[in-house]
């Protein structure tokens, strides 16, 4: 198994249908529960273990998910309310070194739970036309809301797999 990409990299070149969108939204909606159930019994030593050599710790992954998904939510709102807005990327590696990534995971778990409720509520209210709206990432180009939903459904599963595969390898 590839420890960096335990579920593979995001790939989707097909037609983004309502069925696929709903599956992706369900995956985003399920992440807070799955994440909490996976990490709730881990101790500080386990939380401060890297999921792979040179990778983030479990604690950093959890805080990263909160930061990344907050950015996704804001990008969604920008794409809904503006015409192909240019979004500001951030340096996730630098953010992972900031002090708040040392805080208890419960803070980010609560944030992720609340954020995903709002995010999924908004996503479920979008029309098929809304799904085609885009934002422009300076490095990746224009991305539709529909595709971005898929990216973030994958993103949550990707990082959850980092944690679950570590737990399995360590027999936690």
From Swiss-Prot:
It is found in: Cytoplasm. InterPro entries: DinB-like (IPR024775), DinB/YfiT-like (IPR034660), Put_metal_dep_hydrolase_YfiT (IPR023774). The keyword Methyltransferase does not apply. One of its GO terms (cellular component) is cytoplasm. It comes from the Bacteria. Its EC number is 3.-.-.-. Its cofactor is Zn(2+). This is Putative metal-dependent hydrolase OB0782. It comes from Oceanobacillus iheyensis (strain DSM 14371 / CIP 107618 / JCM 11309 / KCTC 3954 / HTE831).
């Amino acid at each position: 198994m590839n420890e960096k990409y335990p579920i593979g990299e995001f790939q989707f070149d097909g037609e983004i249908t309502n069925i696929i969108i709903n599956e992706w939204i369900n995956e985003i909606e399920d992440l807070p529960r799955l994440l909490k159930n996976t990490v709730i019994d881990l101790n500080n030593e386990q939380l401060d273990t890297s999921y792979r050599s040179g990778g983030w710790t479990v604690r950093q992954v959890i805080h990263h998910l909160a930061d990344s998904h907050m950015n996704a939510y804001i990008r969604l709102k920008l794409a809904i309310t503006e015409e192909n807005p240019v979004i500001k990327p951030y340096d996730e590696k630098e953010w992972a070194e900031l002090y708040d990534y040392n805080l208890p995971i419960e803070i980010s778990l609560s944030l992720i739970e609340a954020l995903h409720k709002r995010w999924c509520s908004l996503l479920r209210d979008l029309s098929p036309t809304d799904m085609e709206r885009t934002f422009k990432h300076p490095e990746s180009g224009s991305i539709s809301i529909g595709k971005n939903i898929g990216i973030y459904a994958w993103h949550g599963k990707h990082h959850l797999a980092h944690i679950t595969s570590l737990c399995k390898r360590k027999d936690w």
